[in-house]
């Protein structure tokens, strides 16, 4: 499967690209700057210490056009501009949105959640794309970039997924479970992205409080 990681030069995108490439998928890292994307693809090969992985860099629009599914891994402030640049390219495809509405608190390193009129970043993306058949899922919001980039062990975190489209839920779940240690959790409709996205600032602040980098979440006692 060809997977575009849009805005994939940051830690979250790089980590997802790395893990999915290691799982045997064909990954295209996208960026506004194609040269940065090419450099990020090279970094994936260096971290993996392999030169046989199927990973390359391109502009966001080129990556989205070529891929079968796109994962959006940009800061909130870049979400809508990035979606605008790839809107035609992802027409009729599945978009997995990992955007989290957070901002740094003044005077400290802690982060806080930003309330959005649409309810969540994923719902905002879905409304922007709703007239062209793009199915949106919220996923990968709560998974630590540090854990993704540390390939010496599995990722100790569930992936909470929400979407109004069954095929998007299933595809996001399939990709999540290609990452060693990750279990996909079907959280229902996209409205639940409002809760999923709010967990991330809590995890980040727990990291800061406990001087760690990879706090995660597990949902217990679910049926197999």
Swiss-Prot record:
Q: What InterPro entries does the annotation carry? A: NAD(P)-bd_dom_sf, NpdG, P5C_Rdtase_cat_N, STEAP_metalloreductase
The record describes the dependence of activity on pH as: Optimum pH is 3.5 for F420 reduction with NADPH, and 8.0 for NADP(+) reduction with F420H(2).
A single GO BP term for this record reads: NADPH regeneration
Recorded GO terms, molecular function?
8-hydroxy-5-deazaflavin:NADPH oxidoreductase activity; coenzyme F420 binding; cupric reductase (NADH) activity; ferric-chelate reductase (NADPH) activity; NADP binding; oxidoreductase activity, acting on NAD(P)H
Write out the catalysed reaction: reduced coenzyme F420-(gamma-L-Glu)(n) + NADP(+) = oxidized coenzyme F420-(gamma-L-Glu)(n) + NADPH + 2 H(+)
Q: Which domain of life is it from?
A: Archaea
Residues annotated as binding NADP(+): 9-12, 31-32, 36, 74, 100, 145
Record key words, sorted: NADP, Oxidoreductase
Does the entry feature the keyword NADP, yes or no? yes
State how it assembles.
Homotetramer.
Q: Which family does it belong to?
A: Belongs to the F420-dependent NADP reductase family.
In Swiss-Prot or TrEMBL terms, this protein is called F420-dependent NADP reductase
Q: What is the lineage of its organism?
A: Archaea, Methanobacteriati, Methanobacteriota, Methanomada group, Methanobacteria
């Amino acid at each position: 499967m060809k997977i575009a990681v849009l805005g994939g030069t940051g830690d979250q995108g790089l980590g997802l690209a790395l893990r999915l490439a290691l799982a045997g998928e064909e990954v295209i890292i996208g960026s506004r700057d194609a040269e940065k994307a090419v450099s990020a693809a090279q970094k994936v090969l260096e971290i993996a210490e392999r030169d046989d992985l199927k990973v390359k860099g391109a502009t966001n629009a080129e990556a989205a056009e070529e891929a079968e599914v796109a994962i959006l891994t940009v800061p909130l402030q870049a979400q809508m501009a990035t979606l605008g640049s790839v809107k035609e390219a992802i027409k009729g495809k599945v978009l997995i949105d990992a955007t989290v509405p957070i901002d740094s608190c003044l005077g400290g390193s802690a982060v806080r959640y930003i309330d959005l009129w649409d309810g969540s970043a994923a719902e905002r993306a879905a409304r922007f794309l709703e007239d062209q058949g793009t199915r949106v899922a919220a996923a990968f919001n709560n998974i630590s970039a540090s854990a993704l980039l540390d390939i010496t062990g599995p990722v100790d975190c569930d992936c909470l997924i929400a979407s109004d489209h069954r095929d998007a839920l299933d595809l996001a779940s399939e990709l999540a479970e290609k990452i060693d240690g990750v279990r996909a959790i079907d959280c229902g409709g996209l409205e639940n992205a409002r809760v999923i996205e709010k967990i991330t600032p809590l995890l980040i602040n727990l990291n800061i409080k406990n001087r760690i980098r990879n706090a995660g979440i597990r949902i217990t006692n679910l049926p197999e």
